[in-house]
From Swiss-Prot:
Description of how the protein assembles with itself and partners: Homodimer.
Motif, 'KMSKS' region: chain positions: 193-197
Official protein name in the record: Tryptophan--tRNA ligase
Organismal lineage: Bacteria, Bacillati, Bacillota, Bacilli, Bacillales
GO cellular component: cytosol
Record organism: Staphylococcus aureus (strain Mu50 / ATCC 700699)
Gene3D superfamilies reported for this sequence: HUPs, Tyrosyl-Transfer RNA Synthetase
């Protein structure tokens, strides 16, 4: 069975777009792959974080994974900072990366421009740590969006470089892009991806939004003026985005949605979608609360940490042996 790895930062509550584009797809693939789902809190601290808020959001994200349908008997869910091998392997990969290739990373450039009190070194060395996250578990598949594709390509380059210098120690991962239609856009500006860090709360629906508030956001979402319910990302981005959300939450094919609402106006469609979103959030949040407030969540994270440590420790030892670190035993 091939291995799949995915990491999400606990830097905010995931949106309904994250659910449709990632979490829901993870539930589908956990039967077909040996899956590792990592809450990458060490990546989060490359930018300043409030420690209490970070810990709360880490626990929230773990509960969200489980509420989405991740089964701890099928997949490994764990917290990055609880498995020391990540920073160990991250440092080893940092030593074979060049400053030039790290400075060329688009996310580094974007975040460096926003840095107020100097550029944190962690922003620059973020990609080798991300590469370590992946290679530690002999990962074959990494599902990512366009914004992370460059980092995975760097990971593949670092694997090639490491294997060339120290023999074939690491597995080279392949990139898997999200399914077509899995990309959910901003509700008020459907040319931009929905983001949990958006300054305007009307642009996104958080998985922990109050359901009635989320329904209002759907009803006020931007659409065009012709009133025809048709999936056309280039010419009708607003209604296309809402159709994507409808399809993502109901599993109804897009063609069937178009047929169902043929001759209907946007008001009817938005009203129905608002109720679908509301019902989804009510059920989702009930599951979330049952995990967040339970000791079972800690048991699952302990179990995931122990398995991740066992697997990653073996990879780190292979890397250290290849590089000549430590004593020969």
């Amino acid at each position: 069975m091939e291995t799949l790895f995915s990491g999400i930062q606990p830097s905010g509550i995931p949106t309904i777009g994250n659910y449709i584009g990632a979490l829901k797809q993870f539930v589908d693939v956990q039967n077909d792959y040996d899956c590792y789902f990592c809450i990458v809190d060490q990546h989060a601290i490359t930018m300043p974080q409030d420690r209490l808020k970070l810990r709360k959001q880490t626990r929230q994200l773990a509960a969200i994974y489980l509420a989405s349908g991740i089964d701890p008997d099928k997949a490994t869910l764990f917290i990055q900072s609880e498995v020391p091998a990540h920073v160990q392997a991250g440092w080893m990969l940092t030593t074979i990366a060049s400053v030039g290739e790290l400075e060329r990373m688009t996310q580094y450039k974007d975040k460096a421009q926003k840095a107020v009190e100097g550029i944190p070194a962690g922003l620059l060395t973020y990609p080798p740590l991300m590469a370590a996250d992946i290679v530690l578990y002999n990962t074959n598949i990494v599902p990512v969006g366009d914004d992370q594709k460059q980092h995975i390509e760097l990971t593949r380059n670092l694997v090639d470089r490491f294997n060339s210098r120290y023999n074939d120690v690491l597995v080279k991962p392949e990139i898997r892009m999200p399914k077509v239609g899995g990309r959910v856009m901003s509700l008020q500006d459907p040319t931009r991806k929905m983001s949990k860090s958006d300054d305007n709360a009307k642009n996104f629906i958080s998985l922990l939004d109050e359901p009635n508030v989320a329904a209002k956001k759907i009803k006020s979402a931007v659409t065009d003026s012709d009133g025809i319910i048709k999936f056309d990302r280039d010419n009708k981005p607003g209604i296309t985005n809402l159709i994507s959300i409808y399809a993502g939450l109901t599993d109804m094919p897009i063609k069937d949605i178009e047929a169902k609402y043929e001759g209907e106006g946007y008001g009817k469609f938005k009203g129905d979608l608002a109720e679908i979103v509301k019902a989804f959030l009510v059920e989702f949040q009930e599951k979330y609360e049952s995990f967040y407030n339970s000791d079972k969540l800690d048991d699952i994270l302990d179990q995931g940490r122990d398995k991740a440590h066992k697997v990653s420790f073996k990879t780190v030892k292979k890397m250290e042996k290849a590089m000549g670190l430590g004593r020969k035993r």
